[in-house]
Amino acid sequence: AETVFVTGNTAIDALKLTVQADYHHEVLDRINPARKMILVTMHRRENQGEPMRRVFRTLRQIVDAHDDVEIVYPVHLSPAREILSDNEKIHLIEPLDVLDFHNIAAKSYFIMSDSGGVQEEAPSLGKPVLVLRDTTERPEGVEAGTLKLVGTETQAVAEAMEALLTDESL
């Protein structure tokens, strides 16, 4: 009998169906197209509380230091609104469905996330991912250089963001 090996990832296959060249979302109307858009997701229980607050403060610091950067963060968590809501270059929006998320991810300069699914999908869009965790279940992405584990400590997150924003070779 012959052996058949099936490999792949249906989430990656879905990207081919959901990402659209003529995609529109109202948040994109509020973003200066000349700026680098960073998409952020952060939801894991391990990051709730102070780890999230550190990342949020770092996001503010980076946005304030870079005139050419805007952030899109689909969120309904109150700590994010408490720390980030009064900055015109940080767009807090309602959580996105998969079609919207894939298309906004495709338009992003890079992505910051603690989501395993995002770690799988973003590299297929050619987007680097700063992983807001100390570990990952996707070590192949780290080995390939498409994912960078940065955790939630302010200095590590800021240095990784600065590197992607300023080093054209990355």
Question: How should these model regions be labeled?
Answer:
Residues 1-170:
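Nucleotide-activated sugar donor-binding and catalytic core shared by glycosyltransferases
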